[in-house]
């Protein structure tokens, strides 16, 4: 019962063609923009501009893009330096479209929106603090902007104990 058997087998490939598959997916969100995208998708109380909004108006100043895209956000230009622009928050007290300010001594009594750039405050709204010129950023470097007009809508991470005139969060590419 100890017999062995030798056998040769000829194997030929039997290839089956499958139909083409098309895979579509959104590009992964960069870690830097994750919280922006989470709040934007959730509709978390703010108004949002994406990179596509800025790409469509790359020839404009950042202030002009904001002025035309975020109704209710007041943009003020410095009368002495008209290329500079600042976001005025909900309790705006400045008439007209320009400010008369002493050279960079800081914010006068009107209520300017606080500004966060890539997660760090660059203007917090303290008296005498230098304002942040939103035109210092070209639209081509902006990945997204969030604007919150009232303290109740500001994300907890950025809502300190100070009174607020709104918050603008700017994300760069």
Model regions: which residues?
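A beta-strand signature from Gram-negative outer-membrane beta-barrel systems
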Residues: 9, 137-173
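Residues that line or immediately flank small-molecule/substrate-binding pockets and catalytic motifs
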Residues: 25, 61, 77, 129, ...
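Amphipathic, non-transmembrane alpha-helical segments in extracytoplasmic/periplasmic proteins
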Residues: 59-70
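Periplasmic plug
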Residues: 86-151
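Short, glycine-/polar-rich solvent-exposed loops and beta-turns at beta-strand/coil boundaries
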Residues: 1-3, 75-87, 138, 158-164
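Short, acidic, small-residue-rich periplasmic hinge/interaction motif at the N-terminus
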Residues: 2-55
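Short beta-strands and strand-coil junctions in structured, solvent-facing domains, enriched
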Residues: 16, 29-31, 56, 72-76, ...
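Soluble periplasmic/extracytoplasmic beta-strand elements of cell-envelope proteins
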Residues: 6-10, 20-24, 48-49, 65, ...
């Amino acid at each position: 019962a100890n017999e062995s058997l030798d056998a040769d087998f000829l194997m030929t490939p039997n290839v089956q063609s499958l139909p083409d598959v098309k895979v579509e997916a959104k590009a992964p969100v960069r870690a830097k923009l994750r919280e922006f995208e989470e709040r934007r998708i959730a509709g978390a109380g703010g108004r949002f501009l994406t990179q596509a909004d800025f790409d469509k108006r790359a020839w404009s100043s950042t202030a002009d893009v904001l002025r035309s895209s975020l109704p209710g956000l007041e943009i003020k230009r410095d009368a002495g330096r008209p290329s500079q622009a600042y976001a005025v928050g909900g309790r705006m007290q400045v008439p007209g479209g320009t400010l008369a300010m002493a050279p960079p001594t800081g914010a006068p009594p009107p209520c300017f929106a606080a500004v966060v750039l890539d997660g760090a405050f660059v203007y917090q709204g303290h008296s005498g603090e230098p304002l942040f010129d939103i035109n210092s950023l070209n639209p081509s470097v902006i990945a997204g902007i969030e604007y919150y007009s009232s303290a109740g809508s500001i994300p907890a991470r950025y809502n300190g104990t100070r009174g607020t005139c709104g918050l603008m969060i700017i994300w760069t590419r």
